[in-house]
Amino acid sequence: MRPVAPKPGKRVLLERIGFIWKHLSFSQKNTFRNLFRYKKRLIMTVFGIGCTTGLMVVGFGLKDSIMNIASLQYDNIQLYDAMAALNTDETDKLDDPDKTLNEIMENESGIETFAKVSMKSMDISSGSNVRTAYTVVCKDAQALESMMVFQSRTTKKTYELTDDGVILTEQMAEALGVGEGDTVSITSGENAPVTAVVAHVMENYLMHYVYMTEGCYEKVFQTEPEYNMYWLKLNKDGRANEDALGQRLMDHDEILTVTYVSTTREMIDGMLSSLY
């Protein structure tokens, strides 16, 4: 009347290794039996664990890369601390704008050094590829050396701004499909496009930029640049009292706004922190 006993199951290889098998729990023994007996389950288990581990590695790598963007940009490339936008309606009234504005900056003890720049949004194109970028022209290229690092991302070779060509940021150069020695078209507003030679391609992580000297700008556009901004590098005291410094600068009619890199960094870090 007793039911027929089931056929004895096949023993897996691990069962023959007694000193290991005896120390396994029931659930562990059951797991190993299922894995060795059912090859599809074994393959799916190994494949699943491998894919999951791979995704975790990629995820952690992306997190580290993304979270370091602000630090890479503002600690290694753009080294200035603030941007003071000029009120051109007021500066145009001055007999000697450079002298007046330079005196304003020099009288602020919190400002270590400064550079007068022209910064405008323009369309950069090559063939059918078009990107919008900030075109930056510095009145004194040497003054920019302490505020910008023009270098290759891969070799870390540093570049100098010259009148022979422009420096493009890497992501834009890739999007346009251009490199050193190629030419790009630059369109400012409703004006006809002009062409410029790409002298170098530089490391960059936030937004697109085209950098050129005053001489290069005049050669390309056949006109003088309109300077509308000062880049400021602050000392320790200036960084500790940014609000007060900004307010004093904006008390001058010639200064329209003051924007701090620290504020931009906080905004970027805040947006990125929401990703995890």
Give the role of each language-model region.
Residues T91-T100, D237-Q247:
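Short, conserved charged micro-motifs
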Residues K157-C216:
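Hydrophobic secondary-structure segments that place a key small or acidic residue at a functional site
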Residues L62, I66-D75, E242-Y276:
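Peri-transmembrane interface segments
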Residues A133, V184, A196-A199, M229, ...:
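Small-residue-enriched segments and motifs
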Residues M1-M44:
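Alpha-helical transmembrane segments of integral membrane proteins
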Residues Y80, R131, D164, D182, ...:
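Envelope-exposed proteins and targeting segments
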Residues I77-Q78, E160-L161, V201-D243, S262:
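Small-residue transmembrane helix packing/gating motifs
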Residues F26-D163, E170-Q171, D182:
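Juxtamembrane segments of multi-pass membrane proteins
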